[in-house]
């Protein structure tokens, strides 16, 4: 567990940013492969990826600022001084979703089909990101006396010297498993929006429950953490999306 992996030409390589970057690369390659297999133009898909990544990063940073408003107001330079850290994943997802919607509108793509192509890679990227969380010590769990507890070093972002629930490991395993499941499910079910809805349903449920084991400062809405509060709406949206054709009384089977 280490915040800084090393230096290249005097530039520090942060473990969190490195794993996020690795996840984005893997997600992009998977998205391009699946998209071209469906007949999409590779250059347009790559441009869409750039926009989606940028909007996702901005969304993650904006929600971080909102949830940590008091801390940011005390030291606004945190926003720019440590831009590689301090992100909220739900903000990144929402920002990325807006990017996908804009790309779909511009290229006259079906937004649900494009989202179906994105989410398997997104889940896998989240898995890499949680490894980054483990290395940096952020998103840590509550204290535990169980044998599964992990102890972070003194230079970690997590409290040192006490066993904590390995919430980063739980989340990483969950995200990787979800990504593999979505790849399998997307190949079996080509109905537009189904893979996206499964991501929304499964991820929101998993995220809601793992939040009970976390103990890092991350904002709250009443008795719920910010992520638990958002998870409720993501879950409802996923259920509605999954049943959208039933609600409309018809099944969409048209080609893009």
From Swiss-Prot:
EC number(s) from the headed UniProt entry: 2.5.1.145
Lineage: superkingdom: Bacteria
Catalytic EC class: transferase
Keyword Ligase included in the entry's annotation: no
A Pfam family matched in the record: LGT
Membrane topology annotation: Multi-pass membrane protein
Entry's transmembrane regions: 11-31, 46-66, 83-103, 142-162, 164-184, 221-241
Binding site for a 1,2-diacyl-sn-glycero-3-phospho-(1'-sn-glycerol): 130
GO cellular component: plasma membrane
Pathway: Protein modification; lipoprotein biosynthesis (diacylglyceryl transfer)
Stored HAMAP family: Lgt (MF_01147)
Function according to Swiss-Prot or TrEMBL: Catalyzes the transfer of the diacylglyceryl group from phosphatidylglycerol to the sulfhydryl group of the N-terminal cysteine of a prolipoprotein, the first step in the formation of mature lipoproteins.
Name of the protein this chain belongs to: Phosphatidylglycerol--prolipoprotein diacylglyceryl transferase 2
Organism: Clostridium perfringens (strain 13 / Type A)
């Amino acid at each position: 567990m280490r915040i800084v992996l090393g230096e290249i030409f005097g530039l520090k390589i942060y473990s969190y940013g490195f794993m996020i970057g690795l996840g984005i690369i893997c997600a992009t390659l998977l998205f391009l492969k699946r998209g071209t297999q469906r007949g999409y133009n590779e250059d347009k898909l790559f441009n869409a990826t750039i926009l989606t990544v940028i909007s996702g990063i901005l969304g993650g940073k904006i929600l971080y600022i909102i949830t940590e408003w008091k801390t940011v107001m005390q030291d606004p330079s945190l926003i720019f001084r440590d831009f590689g850290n301090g992100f909220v994943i739900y903000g990144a997802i929402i920002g990325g979703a807006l990017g996908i919607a804009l790309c779909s509108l511009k290229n006259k793509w079906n937004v649900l089909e494009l989202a179906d192509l994105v989410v398997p890679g997104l889940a896998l990227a989240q898995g890499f990101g949680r490894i980054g969380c483990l290395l940096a010590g952020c998103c840590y769990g509550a204290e535990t006396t169980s044998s599964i507890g992990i102890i972070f070093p003194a230079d970690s972002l997590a409290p040192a010297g006490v066993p904590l629930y390995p919430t980063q490991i739980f989340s990483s395993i969950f995200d990787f498993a979800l990504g593999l499941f979505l790849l399998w499910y997307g190949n079996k079910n080509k109905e537009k929006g189904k893979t996206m809805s499964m991501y929304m349903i499964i991820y929101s449920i998993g995220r809601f429950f793992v939040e009970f084991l976390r103990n890092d400062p991350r904002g709250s809405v009443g008795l719920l953490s910010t992520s638990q509060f958002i998870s409720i709406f993501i879950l409802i949206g996923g259920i509605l999306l999954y049943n959208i054709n039933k609600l409309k009384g018809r099944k969409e089977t048209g080609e893009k």
